[in-house]
């Protein structure tokens, strides 16, 4: 069965696992999911990520969630651009999440990066999601 929005699936799985206190999340892997998870790891929202081969020879992404004093580090995880309505922003129009306390993950011509990195690189792109 094909998935219409794999990025939304990734975000919902992370949000649901954090809500019930799970340590890890396993889901089918893709290049964009790994890139988004790598940004989350670089920004300190998750502990680790691993790509492994499942028994059916499909790549599987395992994300190790991060908690602080028993509460998940990720409080808000929201999809912005979606398959039915893509949201593109220029370098001067990139959003700031919670006045700079959160991040927006942007898909640019130079790869997937945070809003701050995109501003620094002077590029705009598709605003994938917000994390706080």
From Swiss-Prot:
Gene name in the database record: rpsH
Subunit structure: Part of the 30S ribosomal subunit. Contacts proteins S5 and S12.
One Pfam family matching this protein: Ribosomal_S8
Biological process (GO), any one: translation
NCBIfam families noted in UniProt: PRK00136.1
PANTHER family assigned: 40S RIBOSOMAL PROTEIN S15A
Transmembrane found in the keyword field: no
Keyword terms: Ribonucleoprotein, Ribosomal protein, RNA-binding, rRNA-binding
Highest taxon listed in the record's lineage: Bacteria
Name of the protein in question: Small ribosomal subunit protein uS8
Function, in words: One of the primary rRNA binding proteins, it binds directly to 16S rRNA central domain where it helps coordinate assembly of the platform of the 30S subunit.
SUPFAM superfamilies: Ribosomal protein S8
Similarity comment: family membership: Belongs to the universal ribosomal protein uS8 family.
Cellular component aspect of the GO annotation: ribonucleoprotein complex; ribosome
Organism phylogeny: Bacteria, Pseudomonadati, Pseudomonadota, Gammaproteobacteria, Lysobacterales
GO molecular function: rRNA binding; structural constituent of ribosome
């Amino acid at each position: 069965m094909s998935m219409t929005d794999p990025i939304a699936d990734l975000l919902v799985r992370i949000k649901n696992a954090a809500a019930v206190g799970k340590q890890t999340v396993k889901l089918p892997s893709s290049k964009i999911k790994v890139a988004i998870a790598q940004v989350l790891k670089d920004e300190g929202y998750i502990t680790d990520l691993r790509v492994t081969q499942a028994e059916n020879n499909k790549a599987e992404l395992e994300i190790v969630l991060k908690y602080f004093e028993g509460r998940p580090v990720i409080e808000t995880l929201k999809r912005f651009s979606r398959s039915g309505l893509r949201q593109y922003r220029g370098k001067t129009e990139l959003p700031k999440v919670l006045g700079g306390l959160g991040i927006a993950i942007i898909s640019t011509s130079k790869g997937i990066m945070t809003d701050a990195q995109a501003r620094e690189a002077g590029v705009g792109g598709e605003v994938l999601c917000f994390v706080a």
